[in-house]
C-alpha cells in the first residue's frame, strides 16, 4: 500500500509542475499582447539606420589621388582604379573608379584606410535590381548622394530654420531705436 501512495504523490507533483510550466508560458504569452509590433511595413516605412551603418559607398572624384590603398586593403580586391601618370605635373591622374556592389561585402576597409577621405559609407541599403550588371557603379554613380539625403525633410527644415535665424539677426541688428 505504501508504494501506491508514493506513486499518487509523485503523479500529483508532476501534474502540479506541468500546470506551473503551462501557467508561466501562458503569462509570458499574454505579456506580449501589450507590446507594439517590432516589424515595419517595409516599402511604406523605412527603418532608421544606426550611426555606424555600412551602406552604399559614396566616392568623391576630386579628392582621390589614385593611391590604390582601397584596392590593397579590400579582402576581395574589388575597387577598379584606372589612372595614368602625368609627367608635366608628376602626379597620377585618376581616369576611372568603379565598384561592383554585387560582389562587395561592405566591410568598410576601403573607407577606413583611405588617406584623403574620398570614400564614405552612406545610409542607402536599397541596392536590389533585376540585372546584376546594374550593381557595377562607376565614379559618376558613386558620386551621387542617396535620395534619402537629398530629399530629407529634416535637413531642409534645418537649412530653412538656420536661414530664418540669420535673417532675423540681420533684421534685428539693422534696426535703430529712437527715443521720442
Curated annotation (Swiss-Prot):
Keywords, sorted A to Z: 4Fe-4S, Chloroplast, Iron, Iron-sulfur, Membrane, Metal-binding, NAD, NADP, Plastid, Plastoquinone, Quinone, Repeat, Thylakoid, Translocase
Q: Which GO terms describe its cellular component?
A: chloroplast thylakoid membrane; plastid
Record domain 4Fe-4S ferredoxin-type: where: 55-84, 95-124
Q: Which compartments is it annotated to reside in?
A: Plastid, Chloroplast thylakoid membrane
Catalytic activity, as annotated: a plastoquinone + NADH + (n+1) H(+)(in) = a plastoquinol + NAD(+) + n H(+)(out); a plastoquinone + NADPH + (n+1) H(+)(in) = a plastoquinol + NADP(+) + n H(+)(out)
Checking InterPro entries in the record gives:
4Fe4S_Fe-S-bd (IPR017896), 4Fe4S_Fe_S_CS (IPR017900), NADH_quinone_OxRdtase_chainI (IPR010226), NDHI (IPR004497)
- Which coarse location class describes where this protein primarily resides? plastid
Which cofactors is this protein said to need?
A: [4Fe-4S] cluster
| Binding annotation for [4Fe-4S] cluster 1 | 64, 67, 70, 114
Q: Name one GO molecular function term.
A: iron ion binding
Free-text cofactor note: Binds 2 [4Fe-4S] clusters per subunit.
Q: What Pfam families does the record point to?
A: Fer4_10
Entry keyword Membrane: yes
In which residues is [4Fe-4S] cluster 2 bound? 74, 104, 107, 110
Q: What's its EC? A: 7.1.1.-
Function field: NDH shuttles electrons from NAD(P)H:plastoquinone, via FMN and iron-sulfur (Fe-S) centers, to quinones in the photosynthetic chain and possibly in a chloroplast respiratory chain. The immediate electron acceptor for the enzyme in this species is believed to be plastoquinone. Couples the redox reaction to proton translocation, and thus conserves the redox energy in a proton gradient.
Describe the family membership recorded for this protein in Swiss-Prot or TrEMBL. Answer: Belongs to the complex I 23 kDa subunit family.
Q: How does it assemble?
A: NDH is composed of at least 16 different subunits, 5 of which are encoded in the nucleus.
Which PANTHER family does the entry mention? NAD(P)H-QUINONE OXIDOREDUCTASE SUBUNIT I, CHLOROPLASTIC
HAMAP family per the UniProt record, alphabetical: NDH1_NuoI (MF_01351)
* Official protein name in the record: NAD(P)H-quinone oxidoreductase subunit I, chloroplastic
